[in-house]
């Protein structure tokens, strides 16, 4: 039978519940347990697909095509279990399901209320998510509840967790509470009152945490831990200090050294083998002792909030691990390039243009791509970055001066990138979409395997085929491909069913390393294995730096 660990947060958001939950999962997995994770988001949106990256951060896409919270990316990077749509749900999905049942008559005329109907539905979603784990029936399901204790939006989720713990019985569920212990510089000390009040809030709704994870900018002294223990009614050894680290991959060892996994296993009456965190210590060793160093420029419009590119940043870090190369990322605002030109790019070893939506900043990205192509600087374009690379090539090499995407210029005569009007859904039916279709849930999403053209750089990187995740509604227009290929551009991978361009590259006779991909390879990169595309990109950046004698 699956046992549950509920992870809650207090005082403020963005303390790192997702990293803490993923780190605990990594330790338990190293002890031989089958582990899955779920993220419960209290917002009313059905999914984060149409939310601004400035508000929500990155949207992580699962293999089965779900648009989910970025914490699911952390989960996949820390454990071997792949996430699915059922691993993330929102208040919007819960209410949508309950209202659908009410309309269908499932409640037999009863008054539908938050308790019991909403809370019962939350419990059903949790158990369904755990049961659908790709690892088989998990020994432990770690459930991260978004928001903070005291938020009105989180109350139904906390109440559902309390009810579920009571229903499952002793030693079947436990609670881990992550809270802030701020350092007040004027007083010269850590303050425990916010943590005490946060735990009191939790106890008011009937939840007594078994473990406190105390976030601070430094290790919490023993006397402060004793104070927290006494006022929170949590055993002293279960008050665990979680201080700022320069790498998230140090957190599993930090938590294990303080006995978090032992406490959880004792509470849930589990007797697994001892933890083996050798892999994590080796990763940290590689991170801290690189042999080389490169600087890669990431040109985008969300550069002020790096959470928007969380998986991409981590994928570059993974590549640094597997190439013994420290990767410095410079975030460059594409709108500044539109104003000031490309001088800010001239010291870079490589240029990367990530995915994005909307017209703002696109001409700056195109200028950056042109610079990378003409200066022979390694270039990687992801999703929109590939589309803009094709537009740049069409304008400046092929001579299609009005080449553009209908996303930015609906009336452009040279629609090099256009909306895919006919899509195949998962049942194989054709669905026609237009520019007026709803935005939510209307993208090409999830994994798709594609054959790769022999003799290309793509084949050197991936092999005979590529299986990556997608999130887009625009594609390179096949009508212009013959002209692009006549100019030298290579379409190196296509979808087998719709024949859509998936990868493009320039031959080495034109450029040493210039690749665009319509998919999002960053979603499948892990610290354990890295990713072949990002490893090749970092190696190309290093070769460029060495060739320049820098």
Curated annotation (Swiss-Prot):
Alphabetized InterPro entries for the sequence: Class_I_gatase-like (IPR029062), CTP_synthase (IPR004468), CTP_synthase_N (IPR017456), GATASE (IPR017926), GATase1_CTP_Synthase (IPR033828), P-loop_NTPase (IPR027417)
Region Amidoligase domain, residue ranges: 1-270
Binding site for ATP: 14-19, 71
CDD domains from the UniProt entry: CTPS_N (cd03113), GATase1_CTP_Synthase (cd01746)
GO cellular component: cytosol
Presence of the UniProt keyword Metal-binding in the record: yes
Entry binding sites for CTP: 13, 151-153, 191-196, 227
Pathway: Pyrimidine metabolism; CTP biosynthesis via de novo pathway; CTP from UDP: step 2/2
Superkingdom of origin organism: Bacteria
Record function comment: Catalyzes the ATP-dependent amination of UTP to CTP with either L-glutamine or ammonia as the source of nitrogen. Regulates intracellular CTP levels through interactions with the four ribonucleotide triphosphates.
Family from the record: Belongs to the CTP synthase family.
Designated name of the protein: CTP synthase
